[in-house]
Curated annotation (Swiss-Prot):
Belongs to the DMRL synthase family. One of its GO terms (molecular function) is 6,7-dimethyl-8-ribityllumazine synthase activity. This is 6,7-dimethyl-8-ribityllumazine synthase. The keyword Ribosomal protein does not apply. Catalyzes the formation of 6,7-dimethyl-8-ribityllumazine by condensation of 5-amino-6-(D-ribitylamino)uracil with 3,4-dihydroxy-2-butanone 4-phosphate. This is the penultimate step in the biosynthesis of riboflavin. NCBIfam families: lumazine-synth. It comes from Picosynechococcus sp. (strain ATCC 27264 / PCC 7002 / PR-6) (Agmenellum quadruplicatum).
């Protein structure tokens, strides 16, 4: 029996990535993006928007992330897709609908295409919680980038 495991440094200069970012709550999503870019840069990926390694796609909000991620995955051009967003609970059930649908949609995009689609959408009760998860001490954007690198590596091995 073989054991397969992805790594973070398997020829990262050859990867083609897409990052889909929800513009709603951009105070948070822009910080997640910065953390994601920092991680990718430190692992040898050219994060320049004018470069050839990463396409950045901004969408109005989290609900639109799944559709765009699926279209990108269907294109066959990407080794991994990272989806970044922030859904913050309010006074209505809107939070529940958006959070549920974006998580299902991102998972479906990966299952239906075989392309790693990383779920980097924060679901928090308050803006403060979201900012803490996208801050200097603990920016989850970094972890989402690592997941993309590891999954792209793993999918190339199995």
């Amino acid at each position: 029996m073989a054991t397969f495991e992805g790594t973070y440094n398997d020829n990262t200069q050859a990867l083609k990535l897409a990052i889909v970012i929800g513009r709603f709550n951009d105070l948070v999503t822009s910080k997640l993006l910065a953390g994601c870019q920092d991680c990718l840069r430190r692992h040898g990926v050219n994060t320049d928007p004018e470069g050839a390694q990463i396409d950045y796609i901004w969408v109005p909000g989290c609900f639109e992330i799944s559709l765009v991620a699926k279209k990108l995955a269907d294109s066959g051009k990407y080794d991994a897709i990272i989806c970044l967003g922030a859904v913050i609970r309010g006074d209505t059930p809107h939070f529940d609908y958006v959070a549920a649908e974006v998580s299902k949609g991102v998972a479906a995009a990966a299952f239906q295409t075989g392309v790693p689609v990383i779920f980097g959408v924060l679901t928090t009760d308050t803006m403060q919680q979201a900012l803490e998860r996208a801050g200097i001490k603990n920016n989850l954007g970094w972890g989402y980038a690592l997941s993309a690198l590891e999954m792209a590596s793993l999918m190339g091995k199995i």
